[in-house]
């Protein structure tokens, strides 16, 4: 009888040990993912993007020794109301640390998918440059609304704040060492600082609080080949989609 009890106790102890190790591994990977993103997100907010001319980023053997690198920043909002096309507006900017110049484009898109048809992409690009932290069109823009949107545009990196990133809990963690790829997703509330900032700047047609997705590929410790992006998903189903995406990373300059 005593032997049976001892075996039962031993079995329960082993079960708890396995559960603890598994949970610990999951928590460890979540912490790694957060730490990987924190390297960049801790810089937010970057109110003056020209500060990036003097900001170092992750470098590996993909960089020429004389290349300081180019920061690529991209922010976009996508909204699809029921029965309508997916409408996207955003800006991509390349901030060259070698030439201390920045250029890119503001873009709009309407993606329509009719039954049994391939999605139709209608992207328009409006070339821009950045001078004194302001965006200026380098070609004539006839649409007055687009002119204003370019002049008033702010990248997410300029107004967001992730000081509480390490406090996010109960994330849905995914890690594939073969690719490698990784992600962590968190349910936010409408009281979250960054959610408030997005609602302040965009007409978001839902009161639902978004999920925050931290997603990347490449080495968790750093890679110029992979990518990292963050996404706020307010609504996602067959007929309606509302999401905001942002990315900021340093990559080798094109002319080096």
Curated annotation (Swiss-Prot):
Entry membrane topology: Lipid-anchor
Lipidation, S-diacylglycerol cysteine type: 25
Compartments where found: Cell membrane
A Gene Ontology term for the protein's cellular component: plasma membrane
Keywords, in A-Z order: Cell membrane, Lipoprotein, Membrane, Palmitate, Signal
Signal sequence, renumbered to the chain: 1-24
UniProt keyword Signal, yes or no: yes
Presence of keyword Cell division: no
InterPro entries reported in the protein's UniProt record: Csa, Csa_sf
Chain ranges passing through the membrane: none
Lipid positions (N-palmitoyl cysteine): 25
NCBIfam families linked to this entry: SA_tandem_lipo
Family indicated by similarity: Belongs to the staphylococcal tandem lipoprotein family.
Record's protein name: Uncharacterized lipoprotein SAOUHSC_00053
Upper lineage: Bacteria, Bacillati, Bacillota, Bacilli, Bacillales
């Amino acid at each position: 009888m005593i032997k049976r009890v001892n075996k039962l106790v031993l079995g329960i102890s082993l079960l708890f040990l396995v559960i603890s190790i598994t949970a610990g591994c999951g928590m460890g990977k979540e912490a790694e993912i957060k730490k990987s993103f924190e390297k960049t997100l801790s810089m937010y907010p970057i109110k003056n993007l020209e500060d990036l001319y003097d900001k170092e980023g992750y470098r590996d053997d993909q960089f020429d020794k004389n290349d300081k690198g180019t920061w690529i920043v991209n922010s976009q909002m996508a909204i699809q109301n029921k029965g309508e096309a997916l409408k996207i507006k955003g800006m991509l900017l390349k901030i060259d640390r070698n030439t201390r110049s920045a250029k890119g484009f503001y873009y709009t898109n309407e993606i329509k998918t009719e039954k049994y048809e391939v999605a139709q992409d209608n992207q328009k690009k409006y070339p821009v440059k950045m001078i004194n932290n302001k965006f200026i069109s380098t070609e004539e823009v006839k649409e007055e609304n687009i002119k204003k949107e370019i002049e008033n545009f702010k990248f997410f990196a300029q107004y967001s704040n992730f000081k509480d990133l390490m406090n996010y809990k109960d994330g849905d963690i995914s890690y594939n060492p073969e690719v490698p790829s990784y992600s962590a997703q968190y349910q936010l509330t409408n009281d979250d600082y960054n959610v408030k900032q997005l609602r302040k700047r965009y007409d978001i047609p839902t009161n639902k609080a978004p999920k925050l997705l931290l997603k990347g590929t490449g080495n968790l410790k750093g890679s110029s080949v992979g990518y990292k992006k963050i996404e706020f998903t307010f609504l996602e189903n067959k007929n309606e989609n509302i999401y905001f995406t942002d990315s900021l990373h340093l990559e080798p300059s094109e002319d080096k």
